[in-house]
Amino acid sequence: MDGAAATVADGTDGAAVTDGAAAAGGPVTRTVDQLVAAARAGLDRPDPARAWAEVTDGARLVDIRPAAQRAREGEIPGALVIERNVLEWRLDPTGSHRIPEAVDHGVRWIVVCSEGYASSLAAASLQELGLYRATDLDGGFVAWAAAGLPTRSVDQGLR
C-alpha cells in the first residue's frame, strides 16, 4: 500500500494513505476538502433566501466568525454571536454552559461563517451532539449579504 490511496473505514473515498500507514496501524489522513464534503453530506444547507424564511419561522442563526472578521464584514441582525471555540458548549441543551435558547435537541440552528466552509464542519459537530436539525448557511455571510438580506455593522456582543 506504499503511497496508495485507500478508503477509510467510514466509506469516505480519496483518503491518502502514505507509506503503508493504515496497514501498519498508523494514521489515515484526509484533506480538509474531504472533511468538508463529508460534513456537508449530512446537512440540509439552505441558501440565503431559504435561511431567511426559516428564521422567520423560528430557526436561529448562529454567527461563529471571529470578532475581527465580523468587524470587517458586518453581521446579521438577530443572529446569535457564538465564536467557534465555544459553540458546542453553548448549544448543547444538556450542558451547564448552554445559552437560554438551547432548549432542546430539536432547535433549528443555522450556523454562519464567512463563506460556508467552517460552518459546515461546525454544523456537523452539532449534529454529532444530537442537534439533529443543525445545518449551515450555503455560501455563508458573503452569500447572505450578496442576496441583499439584512446586515449591519458589528455590535461586539459575544455569548
Set out the residue ranges of the language-model regions.
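Rhodanese-like catalytic fold shared by cysteine-dependent sulfurtransferases
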Residues: 1-59, 67-109, 117-159
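Active-site flanking residues adjacent to catalytic metal/cofactor-binding acidic residues
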Residues: 62
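Short, surface-exposed ligand- or partner-binding patches at beta-edge/loop junctions that are enriched
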Residues: 112
